[in-house]
Amino acid sequence: MLAQSCCLRLLILLLLFTSICSVPKKSLKYFRNRKLRERRIKLFGTKKTEIQSLLISTWNYTDANLQAWSVLQQGHRRTRQAVIQGCMACQNQRCGLLLAGRSSPDTEGALTLEAAIMDGESLEYGAVAGMDGVRNAILVADAVLKYTKHSVLVGKSATKFARSLGYKEEYLTDARTKNVLKKWSSNGCQPNFWRDVHPSPAENCGPYSPLPEHLHQHPMHQEYAITQGQHDQLAFLALDAEGKFHVASQSSGAQFRIPGRVGDSAVPGAGIYADNEVGGAVASGDGDVLMRHLPAFLAVEAMRAGKDPDQAAEWVVQRLLRHNTEFNGAVVVVNRRGIYAAACAGLDEFNFVVSGGKEYLSMARVERVKCLERENEVIDGGPKGLFPTIPEKQEVP
């Protein structure tokens, strides 16, 4: 009986072993793939707790980016303060002569600033445009968002609003401004933004009068030229570990603009846009083209429709090029998980600075995109770590 019992137990164990070994290979492959998928999900950071903080700024000003990044790292819900700090950091020569404000007058020599900030949670937007006499325009834009039911204030009234809140009025024009304007005037007022007027704006300073419509010629000049260090706008995007976005932009306005012109920094969706449910985007380039097409808004909506950040960035730039073949500029797109991409056109190269997004690359690094007039190279990065173009590491103080 004992021998029979032992044999029975051995038979049962043998059957169990055979059953386990006979599991189809497909099932084993399924379990392996499931583990890979779980690992991939973690890598992409789909869970709220797995989103890594990210600070992106256009162009290659690492100092301003680092100042904004340090604010973002200080604690809970600091995206708003971070983008404001980034904009304020560029009110000096380290962010270029035009962004400093004193080298970007209008045709009458006036220096005016514009700025905007957007909350990705509430979708509230605050902006000022054509504001003179107040240096930190981003603070006034933030005040528009916080203390009014409006979205944009302009001109002298924006300055008056700022003064009513205690912001100091400052005379921004100096000798440098006057020299820049004098040199421009002696060069036949070139470049300028007039067209279809008489005398020819390509050769004369005006005053101008309209040409008859049958004499109109389009285009009379190329799009507004943008080069590294010679641009008038800078944008910041901040994403925290909770998936909260803030975006902001500040500009001194296009150099030698017609007085009264409003730029893309003040127009919702042109230079900045964010929605916590989807992601955010910042754009830089020819502001008048950006205002016509709202690329930052389009990029976010493209992601809402299912496009990845790299697809959204490239699609937006291609759309701009279809209507403006000489367009100069770029767009940087970030989804709600912190995956980012950039595309550009009309420049030799577009640079943007990234802090965070990767635990082992948390400090500011400069990403570079080589741009072609018609063909756009896309940089794709973020938590999944794809970088087709790897720049040389830049030393950060």
Swiss-Prot record:
- What top-level branch of life does the organism fall under? Eukaryota
Please give the SUPFAM superfamilies that the UniProt record associates with this protein: N-terminal nucleophile aminohydrolases (Ntn hydrolases)
Q: Does the keyword Disulfide bond apply?
A: yes
Record-annotated disulphide pairs: 90-95, 189-205, 344-371
Give the UniProt keywords, A-Z. Answer: Disulfide bond, Signal
Residues of the signal peptide: 1-22
Cellular component terms, GO, for this chain's entry? lysosome
GO MF entries: N4-(beta-N-acetylglucosaminyl)-L-asparaginase activity
| Pfam families tied to this protein | Asparaginase_2
| UniProt-listed InterPro entries | Ntn_hydrolases_N, Peptidase_T2
Does this UniProt record's set of keywords contain Coiled coil?
no
Gene3D superfamilies hit by this protein: (Glycosyl)asparaginase
Task: Tell me the PANTHER family matching this sequence.
Answer: L-ASPARAGINASE, N(4)-(BETA-N-ACETYLGLUCOSAMINYL)-L-ASPARAGINASE
Q: Which family does it belong to?
A: Belongs to the Ntn-hydrolase family.
What is the protein named?
L-asparaginase-like protein GM15681
